[in-house]
Amino acid sequence: MSAGIGESRTELLTWLNGLLNLNYKKIEECGTGAAYCQIMDSIYGDLPMNRVKFNATAEYEFQTNYKILQSCFSRHGIEKTVYVDKLIRCKFQDNLEFLQWLKKHWIRHKDESVYDPDARRKYRPIITNNSATKPRTVSNPTTAKRSSSTGTGSAMSGGLATRHSSLGINGSRKTSVTQGQLVAIQAELTKSQETIGSLNEEIEQYKGTVSTLEIEREFYFNKLRDIEILVHTTQDLINEGVYKFNDETITGHGNGNGGALLRFVKKVESILYATAEGFEMNDGEDELNDKNLGEHGTVPNQGGYANSNGEVNGNEGSNHDVIMQNDEGEVGVSNNLIIDEETF
């Protein structure tokens, strides 16, 4: 028999499909790790084949198969490095070389016992020659002992033999029923594990979505807080008389422009505090926001409207400055204010 090294893909696929009763068309299909696991199981017969996923499609399922394979290598002291990260990519060359090595190992260590791949995929225990001869070894001393008894003992022994024979038949029936139940339970367990894996994937996707939404929420919340700080700062400056333009513009008295800035600020404030129908403010969130504002002086200002001293700087971080400052330090109202009542 060939050692397997240097064999063509056709020869290897023929050997693999014949050994495991599969229908692989390409060497790359071995990249899932399932076939590798069953090749080792055909040698040692101790792999948990119910956990091996032959219909694996996700990378985490491939990883599960290779963990089972590596456990087998460790258990039997096989010194072979398995490059899982290369094999799971299902590339031809990597899987060809590993399959060649596996066939060589199989030729060296496989005994003459018959291997049933279909039964093992359903996780039926392999019956070896040693296990088949064990009942005979146990029964021989008993038979010899009974043959040396007296006539009365022989009669009793005959009755016992009949009973033991009957128990043996019932026991074998009970064992076969237990095996059937075991296969059904293992199939159900495999299905449950697949469902759990699918649900875990969905959970990871939802976590990513929630993380993105939280980032967006913080981004827009900070913008609204900046606008709120700007509105309150402007109102304070108006009330303190910091603005050096006539009172008619500020208060709306007389025949002038009439409180354009103040009306604008009030409109912005009303928009900020407007709520949808059925919406209730959360007092806990308000207290938290006030606490954050008190600790840091102001909420981080993305628009550059107010510094930590409450001073307004309209020349940083905004393309639509509402409050402007001239070279002499005097504060003025921008001509870009929206004051048309219909706009609101």
From Swiss-Prot:
In-chain residues carrying the UniProt-annotated modification N-acetylserine: 2
Cell location: Cytoplasm, Cytoskeleton
Alphabetized UniProt keyword annotations: Acetylation, Cell cycle, Cell division, Cytoplasm, Cytoskeleton, Microtubule, Mitosis, Phosphoprotein
Renumbered residue ranges of the record's region Disordered: 126-173, 292-312
Residue ranges, compositional bias (Polar residues): 127-146, 163-173
Sample GO molecular function, one term: microtubule plus-end binding
Residues carrying Phosphoserine: 157
Biased composition (Low complexity): 147-159
Cellular component GO terms, alphabetical: cytoplasmic microtubule; microtubule organizing center; microtubule plus-end; mitotic spindle; spindle midzone; spindle pole
Record flagged with keyword Cell cycle: yes
A biological process from GO: microtubule nucleation
Ranges for domain EB1 C-terminal: 188-281
Residue span, Calponin-homology (CH) domain: 6-107
SUPFAM superfamilies: Calponin-homology domain, CH-domain, EB1 dimerisation domain-like
Keyword check for Cell cycle: yes
UniProt family annotation: Belongs to the MAPRE family.
Additional detail: Present with 3630 molecules/cell in log phase SD medium.
Role description: Binds microtubules.
Designated name of the protein: Protein BIM1
Organism listed in the record: Saccharomyces cerevisiae (strain ATCC 204508 / S288c)
Biological classification of the source: Eukaryota, Fungi, Dikarya, Ascomycota, Saccharomycotina
Gene name per UniProt: BIM1
